[in-house]
Amino acid sequence: MNGPATEKKMGEIFDLQHFCLDDGPGIRTTVFLKGCPLRCIWCHNPESYEKRDTISYNESKCSGCGACVEVCPQKAHRIVTGLHRFEREACTRCGACTEVCCYGALKKIGRTVTAEEVIAEVKKDRTFYEKPGPGGITISGGEPLFQPYFLRELLQAAKDEGIHTCLETSGFCAAEPLNAVIPLTDLFLFDLKGERAAYPHLTGVRAEEIYQNLEILLEKKCHVVIRVPLIPGINDTETFFGELAKLYRRQ
């Protein structure tokens, strides 16, 4: 699985967090890749939807000063009766508004990086990976497999440095990119969102491909931890618990 040379070299991330304790064993450095095909109704990272960079707007921080209105070449920002209106359809993501917003209401989300740049940042935490161990890099998103070529290059760079690798995934992808990263991934954190029949309502996608990919990992004896964002009244159903019990008995 080779892919375009440009896509192999560059990727889009929207965050890199140090000293993470909930994204796999030990102390982790978590890299968040942009782009996700799911639209989970409880999503707390909507800025990760698009693979390209985006402009986020936090209304609660806006003072209505109008600085963004003055610099936006597309007139995507307007002040109407003292309130800020952001027309996303007109926005070309030039970022001019974020540079003049002194209240932090407008921010540019996402940056283009190489695998080497990411690993250079990850290596700064190497001392913390050794004790208590086995810490390392966790690649999250978004959906990391939405950038398959960059993901593989990033995992390979980590393995070349002897760094433990962990991939957090929804499992929604073709089988080929998943199979390509299996030899490079020490641990899969596989997120299941709810019972199979409820997937279209909960996430906007069907569950068949997701469970087929989970089956691939289980059959190949990969190290898999199934994780669930348990939300009362939404996905805490007896049917879902029954499906999970069957899967856990296989591990």
Enumerate the predicted regions with their spans.
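Short gly/ser/thr-rich secondary-structure transition/capping motifs
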Residues: 12-14, 80, 168-172
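N-terminal pre-triad scaffold of radical SAM enzymes
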Residues: 14-67, 84-93
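Fold-independent oxyanion-binding glycine-rich loops
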Residues: 16, 34, 46, 88-89, ...
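N-terminal-biased segments
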Residues: 24-25, 32, 49-50, 54-59, ...
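Hydrophobic packing within well-folded, soluble alpha/beta domains
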Residues: 40, 62, 68, 72, ...
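N-terminal pre-core extensions flanking Radical SAM catalytic domains
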Residues: 1-12, 30-31
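Conserved AdoMet/S-adenosylmethionine-binding subsite of the radical SAM
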Residues: 116-251
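Iron-sulfur cluster-binding cysteine motifs and their immediate structural context
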Residues: 41-48, 67-86, 96-111
